[in-house]
Amino acid sequence: MKKNLKRREFLKKAGVAGAAAVGASTLAAPAIAGGHQEWIICSAFGKAGPLGQAIQGFGDNINRYSEKLKVKVYHAGELVPGLEALDAVRSGAAQAAYGAPYYWPNLSDAIEFVATCPFGMNAMEQNAWCYYGGGIEAADKIYNALGVKFLPMGNTGNQMGGWFNKEINTPDDYKGLKMRMPGLGGRTIEKLGATPVLLAGPDVLPALTSGAVDAAEWICPAADLGAGLYQAAKYYYGPGSVSYTHLRAHETDS
């Protein structure tokens, strides 16, 4: 295999299962040792499951094929909590972060639109928008204001409606629910009387088990099975509508 892979070819071979964005900051320079740069990548997701495996595979491929760049992937909670991955980049503690744009609503009012819009585009349409419709450039303006650069890294596709501890038969059944639902989907269920809660992946099952939330939306049946959400809730609904396709985010400071 050629060592100088084109960016798009390399990302395809990385096996990334979520969508991501890379951001560049000038706050900190990467370590240099033995003639190559060393980057730290902070993930907003746990090591297990498709998202953790994706970013780990991405890092492994860089280390395998690149002579000038080496990376160390830290999964959620290993270096910083998952929701602080982008903050680690902006502070200079890491060169890259991998997560979902809707994890950072405290940093930008517009950033949630990069990740998911209720009743919005499917994965193929969103990828087409990114690469052929000016999506990357539009997202980059949002990320540049934060001192980072956006690059897409896959897409989870349409997601499910979520796991609930009671039956949902009408919109009124959302009233009073505390539900793990990030992004614009969370704002939508808030209009129905629910309280949206922002949680990183590793925190979803503990919150659902303890009763800190009454319901939780994650990804899809396969990923939700791996996350063990069936252990904490009886009712599973889909397909999702308020939480459509999810773009994952990867930010770097170099």
Regions found by a protein language model. Name each.
Residues 2-25, 30-126, 136-254:
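N-terminal secretory/targeting leader peptides
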